[in-house]
Amino acid sequence: MADTKYNSIHPGELWLDTDGNPIQAHGGGIIYINDTFYWYGENKEKSKPGSGIWHWGVNCYSSKDMYNWKYEGIIVPPTTEDDKDPLHYTQCMDRPHIIYNDRTSKFVMWIKVMNKENPNIQQMVVLTADNILGPYTRIRAFHPLGMNSGDFDLVKNPSDGKAYIFFDRIHSEMICADLTDDYLDVTGFYSVHMPNVPPFVREAPAFFERKNKKYLFTSAITGYFPNPTETDMFDCFHLPMTKLENPHRGAKAANSCFSQISAVFKYPKADDLYIAIADRWLIDVPPELDYLGISAGLYGDGTHPVIMEEDEYIERAAKFNRPDTRDTSKARYVWLPIRFEANTPIIEWYDEWKIEDFC
């Protein structure tokens, strides 16, 4: 298995590192440094049904070609003693994001943590390091703007180095907030976008910019079950956004190719290649279970009245989101290229694709 070598990307299939082990880097992103790609994310290897283990730290991998990834280790280890600590392995740590601060020469990582006992309590943990591989020093754990902050993305404006955070103020709206110059806090200035109610309110923001247009991919709130991606386009931070159509095309559009986007990576060796980095959290969901049925099971909101009458269907659907039955240790990755029709991003399914074919 250690001799496995890839020369293409196979979305949704098991992806092994250069040691022959399944890659564990969920909900994170990719950063390019000195001709090397670094892929970081949640380590879910121990998150098996009924284990009580939500995560086992933040992993990082390195690669020269984005096909073959070397395991560099756990760059943020879990806390194992104090179960009240936000980084304890039973706490719901998700979606690490890293940006580099040129002023302080620090790598700055933010991590979302949902309280294991009360999911309505969510905060951020901020850490810094001199090297992408650590060691990382914890700076603070806090509620930005005094809010319970859910899924998020960090954004660094390459023109002036100013940074922003997009996060979902849980179950209500999307927030765009300015970061301080050291990227360790928010300034207090923010704007509000996409207000709604579950399951339609947006989460999992993934930002990218192309040809002076800014974009945000988001998903609805259906636990780990996939749903249609939404695209919003805007000209400047804090200005109103224009809602576009679902970027996914074809038969897999309604469930975003059975995935949830965590980041969009602009490939640095091509002029116009953007890659949607997504997780397939659940690999064994029957295709007849659709996201509206899951929504009905989760929220009982009447969005799927026929299925609302089918208790057996709802029970089957809801079980895939329960900690005692779901198995995120088996989660996989769905990486797909993004093409554009004018200013509209399009994501199409490929069983296999090569980066070189899009450069």
Show the residue positions of the predicted features:
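Carbohydrate-active catalytic/glycan-binding domains of CAZyme proteins
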Residues: M1-C359
